[in-house]
């Protein structure tokens, strides 16, 4: 199984659009980090709790969008390459070829999501925290931007920020499952990239203009946003502003895990049927 995952990784590295995405994503991350540091002027204006409050907002500022961009560009061809390179018939020649290939692609997707979130999170915490010497990093968190700190066990500012990236990882898997399903259905990289990237942009736009919409539109769209991958990526599915939805943080986590498992199951069903066609 390990060598199959390594083979998927080699395929991934061979895709030209992936390296373009890495370059653009790296520039976007550097821009986001530079903007955060230059605008906040951590060392001069704010106390330690306020500085960590700003660090908490980095996911909203650039983390979620950068994660979605790297997933939307990096994953579709991984599913479509056998069809586009006309090697799909070879997968079915082995007794368990389809099943093993699906497992390898799913496992690589999980590892890819983990790597993307870890790099973004580590860079954000190291650069932003280092800008003020990690002052108050181990002090108890005083408040949360996205979800109520009272719903969580006592933790430090640094642990709270790290936990946010754990929730971002959950949102990344949620979005990745959607990408796998779309790519398996369309079997075309460009179309999948357009549909998946466009879906995230619609969710992102709703997060900005949603409250201004008429109620008959806002209610169903808000439910779709909050229970979909958009709300999970942008952390609003955990928001303390909506206690009537989530009185405890385990509820959105449990829903997210359930949706991810459902997506991976649907991906297997669609993948198997398409490979037989």
Q: Could you say what each language-model-derived stretch is?
A:
Residues 5-8, 181-185, 255-277:
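Junction motif at the cytosolic side of a transmembrane helix
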Residues 19-28, 115, 259, 263:
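Alpha-helical transmembrane segments
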Residues 21-28, 190-203, 221-222:
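Central hydrophobic cores of alpha-helical transmembrane segments
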Residues 26-82, 103-185, 205-207, 225-253:
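Secretory targeting signals
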Residues 85-89:
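Hydrophobic transmembrane alpha-helix segments characteristic of membrane transport
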Residues 99, 189-190:
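Residues that define the loop-to-transmembrane-helix transition and helix capping
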């Amino acid at each position: 199984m390990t060598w199959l995952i390594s083979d998927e990784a080699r395929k991934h590295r061979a895709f030209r659009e992936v390296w373009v995405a890495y370059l653009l994503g790296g520039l976007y991350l550097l821009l986001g980090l530079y903007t955060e540091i230059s605008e906040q002027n951590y060392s001069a204006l704010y106390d330690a709790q306020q500085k960590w409050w700003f660090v908490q907002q980095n996911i909203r500022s650039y983390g979620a969008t950068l994660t979605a961009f790297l997933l939307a560009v990096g994953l579709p061809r991984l599913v479509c390459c056998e069809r586009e390179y006309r090697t799909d018939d070879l997968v079915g020649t082995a007794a368990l070829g389809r099943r093993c290939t699906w497992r390898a692609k799913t496992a690589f997707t999980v590892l890819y999501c983990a790597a993307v979130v870890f790099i973004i999170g580590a860079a954000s915490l190291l650069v932003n925290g280092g800008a003020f010497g990690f002052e108050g990093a181990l002090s108890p968190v005083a408040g949360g931007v996205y979800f109520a700190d009272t719903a969580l066990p006592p933790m430090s500012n640094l642990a709270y920020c790290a936990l946010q990236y754990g929730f971002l990882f959950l949102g990344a898997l949620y979005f990745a499952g959607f990408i796998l399903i779309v790519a398996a259905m369309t079997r075309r990289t460009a179309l999948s990239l357009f549909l998946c990237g466009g879906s995230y942009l619609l969710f992102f736009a709703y997060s900005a203009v949603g409250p201004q919409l008429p109620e008959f539109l806002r209610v169903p769209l808000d439910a779709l946003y909050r229970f979909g991958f958009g709300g999970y990526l942008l952390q609003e599915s955990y928001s303390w502003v909506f206690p009537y939805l989530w009185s405890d943080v385990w509820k959105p986590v449990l829903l997210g895990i359930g949706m991810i498992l459902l997506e991976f199951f649907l991906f297997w069903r669609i993948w198997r049927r398409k490979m037989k066609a």
